[in-house]
Amino acid sequence: MPYNPPMTPADVLRNGLSASNPGLVQLLGLCPLLAVSTSIHSALGLGLATLAVLVTSNAIASVVARWLLPEVRIAVFVLAIAGAVTSVQLAIAAWWPDLHDALGIFLPLIVTNCLVLARAESFASRQPLGLALIDGVAMGLGFGLVLLALGAVRELLGHGLLLALLPPGAFILLGLMLALRNWRLQARTAPSEAARPEIADRPVA
């Protein structure tokens, strides 16, 4: 069985921002990603709210997972996520009511975002508190950056580009971002593949 070295904080950051970006690689949270990214204002608000929930839920999962029975662990994580989302929603409603109105139903729907529960269950519950917090920050930033990119493009081009502010435009822009990422990965790996020596087939004596 191959040995898998433990992850370092740099590995966790790299996964969240690039290698396992939740928006461009794992394709998690597509519903709010496409629906809310109509402007930088709403994209930034949802990105920060999701980041806060990810950090909080990851911290709780890392601390309490060792004392939970497998049968109730998912339910406890969902309750923790719901509590974090409620706290964030109340804070935004009190301090930024305009943003709260702009996000609408998608703010409480962070509870159902599969990204949040997936990180709590698959990573944070199996890692120490420090790595769980870093993972929450990295995944939140990775998700938020994709939101901001989509929001910026749709806000700049929305009034002059057909469908840019509508859901079909969001799908098209996300597809272009995925294509750009795949092109960059292929361009990066092509030189290493070309430099690999070819081994000629030898007849068996």
Task: Show which residues each predicted segment covers.
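Intrinsically disordered, low-complexity non-transmembrane regions of multi-pass membrane transporters
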Residues: 1-14, 185-205
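Structural signature of hydrophobic alpha-helical transmembrane segments
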Residues: 40-56, 76, 100-111
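Cytoplasmic-side transmembrane-helix entry/capping segments in multi-pass membrane proteins
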Residues: 68-81, 102-108, 132-136, 194-195
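Transmembrane alpha-helix boundary signature
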Residues: 87-103
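Hydrophobic core segments of alpha-helical transmembrane domains in multi-pass membrane transport
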Residues: 30-34, 50-51, 82-89, 111-115, ...
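N-terminal membrane topogenic signal
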Residues: 13-24
